Amino acid sequence: MKKAKIFGTLFVLISVIFGAINTHYLKSILPKIDIDSIDVSLRYMMYHGLGLLIISILPIKEKRYVINLFIIGTLLFSLSILILSFQSISNSNFGWLGPLTPIGGLLLISGWIILLYSFIREK
């Protein structure tokens, strides 16, 4: 599916770019707790970006569900953490994004469960 390839590549690209920015620039302006949060966010974005690229070529019936759960889950989980991590240096309050992080995580877990189910059902 084209959507999985586009989002997968985009997620990997964002992970690499922000990983470099985080390592070489942000460590000098953000507290360690925010740097660690950004690392987690980018790691999960990378995992699920690569997952989307792999899933896009697999012949599984439930592919559409897994792809949508991974895309929406990654956007909610990783982007909410990224934005919240910059709260300490901005004048904005992004606290309302906090509840989106676990929702995104649940969507990612659901995608993995559906993928596992499709592999178990495989003949």
Region locations from a protein language model:
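Polytopic transmembrane helical bundles with strong interfacial aromatic enrichment
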Residues: 1-123
